[in-house]
Regions:
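Short amphipathic alpha-helical coupling elements at transmembrane boundaries
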Residues: 5-15, 50-53, 210, 242-247
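Hydrophobic alpha-helical hairpins/lids featuring a short glycine-rich hinge
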Residues: 3-38, 46
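Membrane-interfacial helix-loop connectors
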Residues: 28-69, 73, 82-102, 230-318
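Hydrophobic alpha-helical transmembrane segments
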Residues: 18-26, 63-64, 98-103, 139-146, ...
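Transmembrane helical segments that form the transport core of multi-pass membrane transport proteins
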Residues: 152, 156-285
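Juxtamembrane and boundary regions of transmembrane helices in multi-pass small-molecule transporters
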Residues: 56-60, 76-77, 86-87, 93-140, ...
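Hydrophobic core segments of alpha-helical transmembrane domains in multi-pass membrane transport
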Residues: 28-29, 106-117, 142-154, 170-178, ...
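Flexible loop linkers connecting adjacent transmembrane helices
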Residues: 1-14, 127, 316-322
Length: 347
């Protein structure tokens, strides 16, 4: 219940909507590189909805801010988005080279957030009094999650092993921790483990019930998209597209267009298609297409998994049209981030 604790903490602080706007956006931006943009956007939008008291004038800019922050935060980390993960595992951009995208990502989020801030109502929601504490083992599981990400990076960087092996190693440690936590619900272990009366009332922890919550339909969607793109490559269409785009327009213009296409088609199939085309580009251009594909999905609510997920959290106020109204502001941040990319990356 880590995010229930976060929600309780925000409610107790008695922050106004303007401060909550920045708090939820900043937390999303910092969480996204570790937990990925979809997870961070979904969880933080739930938190924002909880503290909104149903105020639509706060929900719309806050949700858009969360989507932009999630995609921007995920663009500079190998684990922040499926697109960055694909670029990283293909060897186009190395682990530490993603840091070049940190400043462009910050600009991509800060500019639209700074403009939307003036439309956030200057009100204070009713403060909550509920007290939520971490469940037993919560802090250890948080540590294991961070350790798993570090292990996957280390396996790939130093041992030249596939990143999934580091992830599976971390999952194994989580299973062992889950076995230990199951004993909290068994009375015969209460005295041996020195549990208090409050701790004894916690339900049994079962890792398999958590795994059941994985969205396998999303995984099947990815399999279908990647198979379709592979078929286009096989029959030669990707080669024609690559020649017409990168051959005629040049790498920079083409990579900027890729970001716009990501907002319309979804960034994952677009990035996979670029990787299948494998145009001759230097590090600076691979960083650009990684940035544009990642943050370009923020232009429309359907352009990224984060945006689609957030639309499902609150359909009454936040939808395709309410997001579209702010597209020019988001586009301003998109173009500014490209300008910063030009200044900070080696050419």
């Amino acid at each position: 219940n880590v995010f229930k604790v976060l929600r309780s903490w925000l409610l107790k602080k008695g922050l106004g909507f303007k401060k909550l706007f920045w708090a939820t956006g900043a937390i999303t931006f910092m969480l996204s590189p570790i937990a990925d943009n979809l997870t961070s956007a979904l969880l933080m939008s739930t938190v924002a909805l909880s503290v909104s008291n149903g105020n639509g004038r706060f929900i719309v800019p806050a949700f858009i801010n969360i989507v932009v922050a999630a995609n921007a935060g995920g663009a500079w980390s190998p684990f922040g988005d499926i697109t960055t993960l694909m670029v990283w595992t293909s060897g186009k951009v190395q682990t530490m080279e993603f840091s070049y995208l940190l400043l462009p990502s910050i600009v991509n989020w800060i500019i639209p957030a700074s403009i939307m801030y003036f439309w956030v109502p200057d009100e204070t929601p009713e403060a909550g009094n509920e007290g939520v504490e971490f469940k037993p083992g919560a802090k250890v599981i948080i540590g294991l999650g961070i350790f798993t990400v570090a292990t996957a990076v280390s396996f790939h960087q130093f041992l030249h092993l596939p990143p999934f092996m580091g992830m599976m190693f971390g999952l194994g440690l989580l299973m062992m921790m889950g076995f230990y936590l199951k004993r909290w619900g068994e009375k015969k272990h209460h005295e041996k483990m020195g549990l208090t009366e409050d701790q004894r009332n916690h339900p049994r922890f079962d890792i398999f019930t958590k795994v059941e919550g994985v969205e396998f339909d999303t995984l099947l969607f990815f399999f279908g998209v990647l198979t379709a793109v592979g078929a286009l490559q096989y029959i030669g269409y990707l080669a024609l597209i690559s020649e017409s785009m990168y051959g005629n327009l040049g790498a920079t213009t083409s990579n900027i267009i890729v970001g716009v296409l990501s907002a319309i088609v979804d960034n994952i199939p677009v990035m996979y298609a670029v990787l299948k085309m494998s145009p001759e580009m230097g590090l600076d251009q691979w960083l650009l297409v990684t940035l544009t594909a990642g943050v370009g999905g923020s232009l429309l609510s359907v352009g990224s998994a984060a945006g689609v997920a957030v639309m499902g959290v609150e359909r009454k106020n936040y939808n395709f049209m309410s997001h579209l109204k702010w597209a020019p502001v988001i586009a301003l941040g998109y173009m500014a981030s490209i300008g910063v990319w030009y200044l900070v990356t080696p050419h």
